[in-house]
Amino acid sequence: MVMKAAVDDDASGWELNVPEKMEKSSTSWVDITQDFEDACRELKLGELLHDKLFGLFEAMSAIEMMDPKMDAGMIGNQVNRKVLNFEQAVKDGTIKIKDLSLPELIGIMDTCFCCLITWLEGHSLAQTVFTCLYIHNPDFIEDPAMKAFALGILKICDIAREKVNKAAVFEEEDFQSMTYGFKMANGVTDLRVTGMLKDVEDDMQRRVKSTRSRQGEERDPEVELEHQQCLAAFSRVKFTRVLLTVLIAFTKKETSAVAEAQKLMVQAADLLSAIHTSLHHGIQAQNGTTKGDHPIMMGFEPLVNQRLLPPTFPRYAKIIKREEMVNYFSRLIDRIKTVCEVVNLPNLHCILDFFCEFSEQSPCVLSRSLLQTTFLVDNKKVFGTHLMQDMVKDALRSFVSPPVLSPKCCLYNNHQAKDCIDSFVTHCVRPFCSLVQIHGHNRARQRDKLGHILEEFATLQDEAEKVDAALHTMLLKQEPQRQHLACLGTWVLYHSLRIMIQYLLSGFELELYSMHEYYYIYWYLSEFLYAWLMSTLSRADGSQMAEERIMEEQQKGRSSKKTKKKKKVRPLSREITMSQAYQNMCAGMFKTMVAFDMDGKVRKPKFELDSEQVRYEHRFAPFNSVMTPPPVHYLQFKEMSDLSKYSPPPQPPELYVAASKHFQQAKMILESIPNADREVSRILKVAKPNFVVMKLLAGGHKKESKVPPEFDFSVHKYFPVVKLV
């Protein structure tokens, strides 16, 4: 073993092996073999020396090193060919820059699309899009179709990167924004590129028409093949132009641009079937090179950017297959169409629900970013037109109808009251914008961020209660029959509870909880959070009704005509009903888990370094920053859920019966909801079988078996179907 004792400034000999270096450089080398072996003998068998400089990062790098699946550098050892860059490949004649045949164009375009998608899925540009040599310098390309396509792909990458960076809802596992010094076609305007693509498209369309079969004419197979290939190339060029135009539309501030994007997405969707049916027309990648994970074909070199990659081992990039590419684009188009719908939503609550539902599909980083930038445009206005403060006021009006925001109330034009409410609303803007942004992150990061934002909502809750008290005092002096108690506080509490519920439920989706933890998670949800949520919703509904009564009395005083009373649908009634169903599902699961535990069907770990209390406190740690509702500590939970306080204490069969009643109650509540959506039908698919299983267990079915039950979360992410094994 040889160690360098002095650093040589001359780095020219990097590629030489050690003995040659020793001969050619003036560096003095010291043999440390014996010293190293002596030091090793001091360690016992199995002992390791842990240097303080060797942390988790270095440990992970050591694990990844030389593993072909994790160390991208290993790919170089598997190939014997010479790696050429664009200019070298052109000089060598291994790639064409003019007169590309249609199969070559189609194959290169398809592989470029695959690389683009692999980049959007979190890999680096150097390992994906820039493995296409044509993208390196489109100015050199003489073929008009290839040149326009290369510029189009660069522009798509550039605008997508800008959108994702601006939305800031990505983490290192989602997206790599580095461009490695490549030119992103900044010297050419977006309009010029779309114009070039349109010219190529028109030229292709003329060729498609000229090769089309005419009635009564015998078809030449070669002409038919050319027609199919022209159509395939035309579809791909048009798809590139449409996708680029959609991204350009999203950079405009006008809401009309979203409508334009919607129309273009319909066009893009229509082109996909033509792309799918013509995949076989393109040249295919050679087999047996670099394990087939990265296509080797004319114009592509997976190792060309190997030296640009960072010194830490980058992820091994596996380029997706062409068939998957079409499916991915199809899903992306559907997601972008969904993004366009957000501008039609009337209020902040609907927008928050929309963001939650959109996030549940685990969308890609590009569609998540487009949704964020569509919601809050550069000028910090919602959809580029509404002030966030006005959205907050509308949300308050629709939820609790606070007197201070009613034009018929004396406080509406009171300067002091106006200052109070305006200050509160301004303080609401940041937490609510952050909440919307959180729903743009991937599901795992969302949960972490929801835990942190609770602190901001706790501060807001405190302010809301103070503002409520001040406004109530002002109101009593002028309109004693009216109240302004807990209006703003109720609204903030509602959002805090929703965040807390979402935080706990997402743990099931992310598979964070062990089976033995289910019972206290479901207990906290059913006995505490959903109970608080229903009480909050009922209080908000009561505030709305009280305000409506006052408005009706004022109307009666002015008008002598009798008005027919219509039965009004309460705005919050559906949410109250859904909360009751969720509460029953959680209560049913809690009692099921307790009964399973009593029957010895829940495997518990032998706690050595932690305990149930430690785990419980870890699970609910983010709730400690919230004062309302007050957090339930472990000892409180044990006391409240203790069955021995009942006389006689319930046995497993009684608990199974109680659980079955909860599932039945949830089923009845959900079946009473008109116009049931997908969420309702999903919960019903869990409630019905669970009701039957609980009945069987209550009757003594598989009583002697100690085999743990199975929990199937495939139907619903938060409530499993219980299966007896």
Curated annotation (Swiss-Prot):
Biological processes annotated in GO: negative regulation of apoptotic process; smooth muscle cell proliferation
Subcellular location, principal: cytoplasm
Spans traversing the lipid bilayer: none
Tissue specificity note: Expressed in primary spermatocytes, basal epidermis, interstitial fibroblasts of skeletal muscle, and intestinal crypts.
Source organism superkingdom: Eukaryota
Induction field: In carotid arteries, after mechanic injury.
Keyword Protein biosynthesis found: no
Subcellular localization: Cytoplasm
Pfam families in the record: Mak10
GO CC terms: cytoplasm; NatC complex
Alphabetical keyword list: Cytoplasm
Annotated stretches, region: Disordered: 548-573
Annotated InterPro entries: Naa35/Mak10
Biased segments, Basic residues type: 558-571
Complex formation: Component of the N-terminal acetyltransferase C (NatC) complex, which is composed of NAA35, NAA38 and NAA30.
Functional description taken from the UniProt entry: Auxillary component of the N-terminal acetyltransferase C (NatC) complex which catalyzes acetylation of N-terminal methionine residues. N-terminal acetylation protects proteins from ubiquitination and degradation by the N-end rule pathway. Involved in regulation of apoptosis and proliferation of smooth muscle cells.
Family in the record: Belongs to the MAK10 family.
Protein name per the record: N-alpha-acetyltransferase 35, NatC auxiliary subunit
Organism: Rattus norvegicus (Rat)
